[in-house]
Amino acid sequence: MQKTKLRLIFMIIYKEIAKLNKTFPLLNEEKILLGTDGSVTNILEILFEGECRVETINQKIVANTNYREVILKVNNIPLVYAVSKTPFKNIEEENLREEIKRDLLSADIPIGKIIRKHNLETRREIKYIGIAEIDDYLKSLLKTNYSRLPKRTYNIIYKNKVLMEITEIFAVRGKLVKNTYSID
């Protein structure tokens, strides 16, 4: 039963990306970023061959929920605008809750690395895949001239509860340098 459900979710994501690609032609790396159920941080580090760093734009805690707005950068290139919402009440273990809270508040650590650091077994459920209209503020943060970019929203699930809800806008277009060497 579980395998069937996972297969259905995967097929829906595939179909959503294929449908989106017909109206907004996507780069292959955008398709991968939109559809992954793994770490975006890891994919960015592989694609851009450097460490992913976080620049926090805004952060606040309201009603025991952390709201964080960041730019993910590799080699100082802004690649992703992300907004995360972390309801701390969903982390039942007090020590873990405090450590995650400390990591989110005191350091510019990507969420993928926080999950890896604490060895959390999580899964991601994609809720939305589409295109975002980019205003001048976001164009400036992402150092892009594109007025529309790929966007997704997903939940990170830990122990059957939403650990985080994340919305990401991907600005990788025109920023990935292709290798020009050939292998003989």
From Swiss-Prot:
Listed GO MF terms: lyase activity
EC number(s) reported in the record: 4.1.-.-
InterPro entries: Chorismate_lyase_/UTRA_dom_sf (IPR028978), Rv2949c-like (IPR002800)
Keywords: Lyase
Domain of life assignment: Archaea
Top EC group: lyase
Record-stated family: Belongs to the chorismate pyruvate-lyase type 2 family.
Protein's name according to its UniProt entry: Putative lyase MJ0807
Organism: Methanocaldococcus jannaschii (strain ATCC 43067 / DSM 2661 / JAL-1 / JCM 10045 / NBRC 100440)
